[in-house]
């Protein structure tokens, strides 16, 4: 990482019974090896104490993080408290994870934190306390005053970035959910995100087809002709560099990846399978279209291994590194 933001990052620990507290603590332990900038952990200190015996220091202002970070993990204590038992999610833990997320987003929105990195949460537990959003992405978007339809989920690694047009949709419903306007909107959000977050002045977006061989001229489906090509044409008319639709099976080898900055894919697995095959340990979830930077490691709570010192901190470290890079790029542009 060549640049760091001027302000610290805010990291929500996620569900206290999951691996979030452990991987954040391990990131602080290995901050030099991972080349991490100062960050503030937000959660219940007891969730750290159950999995880690390192030093932490409570702070009430992110500006204090720089002075603390060298010798202790700076920490914001949340109002909802639940130290939790690793591997045993509770309703109290759901309140804890939601409170930490709320505070992290608030710090970023106020400008006190350069970016938000969100730890993994249990949607099942959140739904049990009345959480009304499909996931953290939609919650963050609402708090930022952005319609969830105007954000995009990017999965990013060192050599590949992918964005699905449709996300958590049953495969049987993908074709009926697609529209030229949706493809165009996701493409535009992606291109703007490549400029703002990644500092790419003239990004190139490669668009996949939906059907085998990108429809084979309409022989294997007409979505490419009726939906995808019009969306590409509209983006090109705005001056963006967009290619496709390309057959998805030839888009992700090394030579193909060198020809674009991000791939816009039609459905969830079309985007996530190549990313996870190539960047399983260091793939990062980046939410595009927000006024703040938000990243997350591409893994869940892993309750089955929580508290056993088995959690790999590399995905969280990658999410922190990417948040710092995106925040620094925005600061330079502003």
Predicted regions and their residues:
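Contiguous, glycine/small-aliphatic-enriched amphipathic segments in soluble metabolic enzymes
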Residues: 1-138, 177-266, 270-293, 299-301, ...
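Small-molecule pocket liners
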Residues: 39, 137, 151-152, 161-163
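Short, flexible loop segments at boundaries between secondary-structure elements
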Residues: 143-160, 288-304
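Ligand-binding beta-strand-loop-alpha-helix segment within the catalytic cores
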Residues: 155-185
């Amino acid at each position: 990482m060549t640049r760091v933001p001027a302000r610290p990052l805010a990291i929500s620990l996620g569900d206290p019974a999951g691996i979030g507290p452990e991987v954040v603590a391990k990131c602080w332990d290995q901050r030099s090896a991972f080349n991490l900038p100062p960050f503030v952990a937000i959660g219940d200190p007891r969730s750290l104490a159950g999995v880690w015996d390192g030093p932490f220091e409570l702070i009430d202002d992110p500006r204090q993080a720089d002075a603390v970070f060298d010798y202790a993990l700076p920490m914001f204590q949340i109002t909802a408290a639940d130290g939790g038992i690793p591997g045993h999610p509770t309703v109290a833990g759901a309140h804890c994870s939601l409170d930490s997320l709320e505070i992290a987003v608030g710090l970023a929105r106020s400008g006190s934190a350069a970016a938000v990195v969100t730890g993994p949460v249990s949607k099942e537990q959140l739904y049990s306390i009345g959480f009304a959003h499909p996931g953290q992405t939609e919650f963050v978007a609402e708090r930022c005053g952005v319609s969830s339809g105007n954000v995009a989920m990017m999965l990013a690694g060192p050599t590949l970035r992918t964005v699905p047009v449709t996300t958590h949709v049953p495969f049987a419903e993908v074709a009926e959910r697609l529209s030229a306007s949706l493809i165009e909107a996701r493409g535009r959000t992606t291109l703007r995100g490549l400029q703002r977050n990644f500092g790419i002045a003239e990004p190139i977006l490669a668009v996949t087809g939906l059907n085998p061989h990108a429809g084979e001229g309409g022989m294997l489906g007409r979505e490419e002709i009726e939906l995808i090509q019009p969306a590409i044409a509209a983006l090109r008319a705005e001056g963006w560099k967009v290619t496709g639709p390309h057959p998805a099976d030839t888009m992700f080898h090394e030579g193909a990846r060198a020809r674009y900055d991000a791939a816009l894919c039609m459905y969830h697995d079309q985007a996530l399978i190549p990313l996870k095959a190539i960047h399983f340990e260091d793939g990062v979830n980046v939410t595009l279209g927000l006024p703040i930077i938000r990243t997350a490691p591409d893994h869940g709570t892993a309750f089955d291994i929580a508290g056993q010192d088995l959690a790999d901190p590399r995905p969280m470290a990658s999410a922190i590194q990417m948040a710092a890079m995106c925040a620094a790029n925005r600061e330079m542009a502003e």
